[in-house]
Amino acid sequence: LNAPVVYTFKGKMEVQYENPYEVGMTGLLGMPSGYYSMHEAEVLLMLGTDFPYSAFLPDDIKIAQIDIKPERLGRRAKVDIGLCGDVKLSIQSLLRMLNPKTDDSFLLKQLKRYEGVKKDLAAYTEDKGDVNKIHPEYVMSEIDKLSSDDAVFTVDTGMTCVWGARYLQATGKRHMLGSFNHGSMAVSYTHLRAHETGAYLV
């Protein structure tokens, strides 16, 4: 498709890693590149997502949705095409009928926008702050660097979610747990205890 790939906070660790099409997150914690990629598109393809914040979804373009749970189809947005099925198997079947798109101008436009967003975010980590006033963006970027490639992060609702969304990077092995749908408070410790399996927990 040569299309930008946008993900939710919940899907960050699974979708972001080594993905040349990714242009950042959508939602309240998302990036302009993610938002505009969806709203400036001709068609939005939603894969296995029950993203609950419909205010961030476009309402004036065609939307196709694939989900293994039929009750999710059209629940968050007006869907023009809804397919019930396993996302991986559905995509594999549909690829055989797809004509490859060679025009990548829209993708390149959003990737350029995303590079600007990442540059702006990185600027916050360059200033460590002062004694007893360490900047949280710097702290989170250091946590990202020091954590193992297979770390499991738990984030509480609030600013830790913001910093985690922006500065913890996917490696293909990392996971992140949080109250992504309901925004429940003070859940990170219980998530951590529930995940005590010998993994590197942060």
Place the predicted regions along the sequence by residue.
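Glycine/Thr-rich phosphate-binding loops of Rossmann-like dinucleotide-binding domains
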Residues: 53-55, 73, 92, 163
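Cofactor-pocket helix-loop regions in the catalytic cores of large enzyme subunits
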Residues: 1-20, 112-184
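Conserved small/polar residues in nucleotide/adenosyl-binding loops
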Residues: 190-197
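Glycine-rich, anion-gripping cofactor-binding loops and their flanking helix/strand elements
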Residues: 1-68, 171-189
